[in-house]
Regions:
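Iron-associated oxidoreductase/ferritin-like identity signal
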Residues: 1-196
């Protein structure tokens, strides 16, 4: 607590805060790249708006961490993180999987920062971080849900393709089976907004 009385943060916490701010910007850039990739995808227009929103949220988080560092008169020294060299994010499932990996890495950094704050008795930092940790948990759960949803869509699409391929010219009477017409179609792609 002596460090807080002087208005300073421990070096360990300063370094961890800089790392988290830098990684938030990195995630924001990756999400912006994903948003740009899906901007003209007529089959998955919601991916564009989702990733654009997340890019804005992550950039705002980075600003909040930097503001916290400035509040305690700490040096801002953001480590450089190489931007992903991905121009083709692929299917929605692949993009969500990439997003989930980014969020899990960010969660690890936040947990490390929390551990540093606890070791150094930085109670103000622990209070400040709570909302980010809670939101991170929600984001990861949301992306896991979306990943499972995308897998279900793929499975459903594969099932619908199989009867067409396997049936061929079936039935001597020339009548089509009703089961294909009555099977439920997969729900439309929908990505609801995560809590921010």
């Amino acid at each position: 607590m002596a460090t807080q009385a002087k208005g300073l943060l421990s070096e360990e916490c300063r370094d961890a805060l800089n790392q988290v701010a830098s990684y938030e910007l990195h995630v924001s850039d990756a999400y912006l790249s994903m948003a740009c990739y899906y901007i003209e995808d007529s089959e998955a227009p919601i991916f564009h708006s989702f990733f654009q929103d997340q890019a804005d949220v992550k950039r705002e988080h980075a600003k909040q961490f930097i503001k916290y560092l400035r509040k305690y008169k700490c040096k801002i020294c953001l480590p450089v993180i190489k931007r992903p060299d991905i121009d083709n994010w692929g299917t929605g499932k692949q993009a969500i999987l990439s997003a989930l990996q980014l969020e899990n890495s960010l969660n690890t950094l936040l947990q490390d920062l929390k551990a540093s704050a606890s070791r150094n008795r930085e109670t103000n930092l622990l209070r400040f971080m709570k909302k980010f940790l809670d939101e991170q948990t929600r984001n990861i759960s949301y992306l896991e849900y979306q990943l499972n949803y995308q897998k279900e869509l793929e499975t459903s699409a594969q099932r619908e393709e199989q009867p067409e391929n396997a049936a061929g010219p079936s039935g001597a009477s020339g009548q089509e089976t009703e089961s294909a017409g009555n099977s439920p179609s997969p729900p439309a792609q929908k990505i609801p907004k995560p809590a921010t």
